[in-house]
Amino acid sequence: MLFHNLDGFGSHCGFRLFSCIKDGEFGQGMHFPLLICISLEELLAKFGDRPIRLSTANTYSYQKVDLPFQEYVDQLLEPQDLDSLGSETLYFFGDNNFTEWGSLFQRYRPPPFRIPGTTGAYSFGIAGSGSGVPFHWHGPGFSEVIFGRKRWFLYPPEKTPEFHPNRTTLSWLLDTYPFLPSWERPMECTIHPGEVLYFPDRWWHATLNLDTSVFISTFLG
């Protein structure tokens, strides 16, 4: 079920739950402090006039569009249009301006894990219900939901999923997923506010925002 609702955004503070994939299964580990407690009103007051860079929500996202954050929230932060391709859908995730948005990132405490000799890279985003990115892969990292819920679908590196790179995750879920035999289905989970998912190196994954969601990833390496 998908929801478009920002009520309660910023109200979740406390501790977050770290989850990971180990030996092909999801596991849960330690709790550690959650650090971003912020409302949409506060974000708009501080950053509404600041430009953000949007990407298309497809596997190979080449198109970039810059516009003020306030304009994105007012005009584009809507549920996913079922008739639109991922290559036609603009999505705010990554390409962050760490200078202009520095006060936000300074409030964030990443998961206390890293690859020795490297520094993690942050990607912050806000997106509407039903949006997401279709299957792709990259290096390892952590994904945390601050507000809303994000559903994940994952395959190990050696198992390439059946998908179209320019179609949305929502269309894949409706048109392809129901017809996959059980042995062809991905691992999947839904992460909620204060939960953190570790995604391993080169694992295929697709995401689907079940609500209007605020999220941040820490890419390792």
Question: How does the language model describe each region?
Answer:
Residues M1-L6, S11-V196, W204-G221:
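N-terminal accessory scaffold of Fe(II)-dependent oxygenases
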